[in-house]
Amino acid sequence: MRRKTLKYLTFFLLFIFLTSFVLNYSNTGVPSAWFPKQMLLELSENFRRFIKSQPCTCRHCISQDKVSYWFDQRFNKTMQPLLTVHNALMEEDTYRWWLRLQRERKPNNLSDTVKELFRLVPGNVDPMLNKRLVGCRRCAVVGNSGNLKDSSYGPEIDSHDFVLRMNKAPTVGFEADVGSRTTHHLVYPESFRELGENVNMVLVPFKTTDLQWVISATTTGTITHTYVPVPPKIKVKQEKILIYHPAFIKYVFDNWLQGHGRYPSTGILSIIFSIHICDEVDLYGFGADSKGNWHHYWENNPSAGAFRKTGVHDGDFEYNITTTLAAINKIRIFKGR
């Protein structure tokens, strides 16, 4: 990243020097006094346009088009991952699809719920998610697979700009293998766990009640049960609460999963979320362990892999998506030691 940025800056400075030399010492008749002000402004604008035309300063930029037809057919850079006051109005077909995900009966009015929600939590996109003009944002998406055990990936994971985790994943006691840093943690009410003070909670709402739960959990604590008991109160700073856009869930389902499963898992939602906000993405803790077992790294689960047979998510198809992304050099997958 630094080498590529340095190359751009060197090119820019060299261009200024050569232009200045030509204007001051040739017989063009252009006054040298004109150069410092007007020419610098034009050069600065041209350089800004040049940099803006580059997806990033990484060696491989995820959003670079015309690298893979398969990727270009699925990736829509105009899709906004987070719900805000500016994009909260959903198309009717998207809204009806979302309501069917968990067959919610008599849902509250979504518009009223969103208005109440954004009186409590930020209504604008997390400024950290806005990509810089020049740079390379490296992100680690840490899954919950048992293949993280004894991997010693911890320091490598922590070296990324963003570290995304999901659901009930703990770090305390597992730092050597999974790292200790978390910048964004994706959860839904039934999978919530206490988060660190500076961690951004990204709520993935599968029903209107999930949005109401955020309101309740940060105020009155009246919602204690959905289809299972949920925490009545949470210790998360309101400015650290972000909402995954329901329309983005449908985008993942339509464009990436092409209708496989009932709806996307938190894992694939985290991955597609990351390729929209990051320039480089590394996956850790996805897939089975070396013995072919599917279980969480923090537990010895006698029924490992049972979740793959529920029919809610198509785990095999989702895993094929991740391996294809890796095969075309859009992401990297670290499968454990």
Swiss-Prot record:
Gene Ontology molecular function: beta-D-galactosyl-(1->3)-N-acetyl-beta-D-galactosaminide alpha-2,3- sialyltransferase; beta-galactoside (CMP) alpha-2,3-sialyltransferase activity
Modification after translation, per record: The soluble form derives from the membrane form by proteolytic processing.
Q: Provide this UniProt record's keywords sorted from A to Z.
A: Disulfide bond, Glycoprotein, Glycosyltransferase, Golgi apparatus, Lipid metabolism, Membrane, Secreted, Signal-anchor, Transferase, Transmembrane, Transmembrane helix
Q: Topologically, how does it sit relative to the membrane?
A: Single-pass type II membrane protein
Taken from the UniProt entry, a GO cellular component term is: trans-Golgi network membrane
Organ and tissue specificity: Highly expressed in submaxillary gland and to a much lesser extent in liver, lung, kidney, heart and brain.
Presence of the UniProt keyword Ribosomal protein in the record: no
What does the record say about the knockout?
Knockout mice are deficient in CD8-positive T cells due to increased apoptosis. This is associated with a reduction of naive to memory T cells ratio in blood and peripheral lymphoid organs.
- Glycosylation sites per record: N76, N109, N320
Which reaction does this chain catalyze? a beta-D-galactosyl-(1->3)-N-acetyl-alpha-D-galactosaminyl derivative + CMP-N-acetyl-beta-neuraminate = an N-acetyl-alpha-neuraminyl-(2->3)-beta-D-galactosyl-(1->3)-N-acetyl-alpha-D-galactosaminyl derivative + CMP + H(+); a ganglioside GM1 (d18:1(4E)) + CMP-N-acetyl-beta-neuraminate = a ganglioside GD1a (d18:1(4E)) + CMP + H(+); ganglioside GM1 (d18:1(4E)/18:0) + CMP-N-acetyl-beta-neuraminate = ganglioside GD1a (18:1(4E)/18:0) + CMP + H(+); a ganglioside GA1 + CMP-N-acetyl-beta-neuraminate = a ganglioside GM1b + CMP + H(+)
Per the UniProt entry, what are the Gene Ontology biological process annotations, in alphabetical order?
A: ganglioside biosynthetic process via lactosylceramide; memory B cell differentiation; N-acetylneuraminate metabolic process; negative regulation of activated CD8-positive, alpha-beta T cell apoptotic process; protein glycosylation; protein N-linked glycosylation; protein sialylation; sialylation
Main localization, broad class = Golgi
Transmembrane stretches in the record are: 5-25
- Read off the PANTHER family from this record: ALPHA-2,3-SIALYLTRANSFERASE ST3GAL I ISOFORM X1, CMP-N-ACETYLNEURAMINATE-BETA-GALACTOSAMIDE-ALPHA-2,3-SIALYLTRANSFERASE 1
Name assigned to this protein:
CMP-N-acetylneuraminate-beta-galactosamide-alpha-2,3-sialyltransferase 1
- What organism is listed for this UniProt entry? Mus musculus (Mouse)
